[in-house]
From Swiss-Prot:
Gene3D superfamilies: 1.10.287.1480. Part of the 30S ribosomal subunit. Contacts proteins S3 and S10. The keyword Transcription does not apply. GO terms for biological process: translation. GO terms for cellular component: cytoplasm; small ribosomal subunit. It comes from Ehrlichia chaffeensis (strain ATCC CRL-10679 / Arkansas). The keyword Transport does not apply. This is Small ribosomal subunit protein uS14. Binds 16S rRNA, required for the assembly of 30S particles and may also be responsible for determining the conformation of the 16S rRNA at the A site. GO terms for molecular function: rRNA binding; structural constituent of ribosome. PANTHER family: 30S RIBOSOMAL PROTEIN S14, SMALL RIBOSOMAL SUBUNIT PROTEIN US14M. Belongs to the universal ribosomal protein uS14 family. SUPFAM superfamilies: Glucocorticoid receptor-like (DNA-binding domain).
Length: 101
């Protein structure tokens, strides 16, 4: 299991990203818009760079909700492959059945 501080750091990044998502999108739209003056686009770039690094969705790591495992995590279920197998075998995940042919 991952350290609790690492899991909490990722949760903090998720909350910061959700809070500043609209502001980032607005600034990026200004930067990409060619009809706006170069000076205004530059000021938007400066404002974007002043935002916290953790407000970018790139910094969020997809982790298992139960164990905090960073790799082998299924997005649909938000759990790792190991936990998915355990929960699936005891029937805790609705609609998930063991394959047989």
């Amino acid at each position: 299991m991952s350290r609790k501080s690492v899991i909490q750091r990722n949760l903090k990044r998720i909350s910061i990203c959700n809070r500043l998502k609209n502001k980032r999108e607005e600034l990026k739209a200004i930067i990409k818009d060619q009809s706006i003056s170069m000076n205004d686009r530059f000021l938007a770039q400066v404002k974007l760079s002043k935002l916290p690094r953790d407000s970018s969705y790139i910094r969020i790591r997809n982790r298992c909700l139960i164990t905090g495992r960073p790799r082998g995590c299924y997005r649909k279920f938000k759990v790792s492959r190991i936990v998915l197998r355990q929960l699936g075998s005891i029937g805790q995940i609705p609609g998930l059945t063991k394959s047989s042919w």
